[in-house]
Amino acid sequence: MRFVVYKHSLVLGDNNIVTKQFIVLKHDDGNLQFTDFHRYVKSTSRIKSISDDGNKRFSYVVKFLNFIFGTSGLKSIDQLTLEMVREFFTLYGLSQLPGDREKRKKSTVEKCVNAVLDFLTLYLSEREGKAKLKAEELYSTTTFTNSRGRVIKRKEPNFEI
């Protein structure tokens, strides 16, 4: 049994096709069991289009979920520790996760880190008091000004990757 991304397409109005992604558990016999983890995968854009499907962010989160439930043997994300998150990012960056075949660019690793940190932030803030890990333990927020003079807030992991 493992987590996979399930894509569902809807036809709206005049041949407008909207694809939504869900994180589901795929059992060994092929049956799918829907989860609500898709609620915690947020879009990178502030204004979300109805046709926004989360793109690659879902695949990063699914890799993370398969690692923590498969390798670490967790029964619930509430049992997650900072060491498990750190171990996933280290193995992901070194391309040493089970099933990895190719090397990754630094930018790809950073996208994965951001997607998983956003996922965990939303999940842990909703499960505050029930989960071992707190969102504040994962990252610190740094503020800087870009070339256009806009103030940008960036999440920096509290550990080396």
What are these regions, as identified by a protein language model?
Residues 1-161:
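Charge-rich, intrinsically disordered N-terminal extensions
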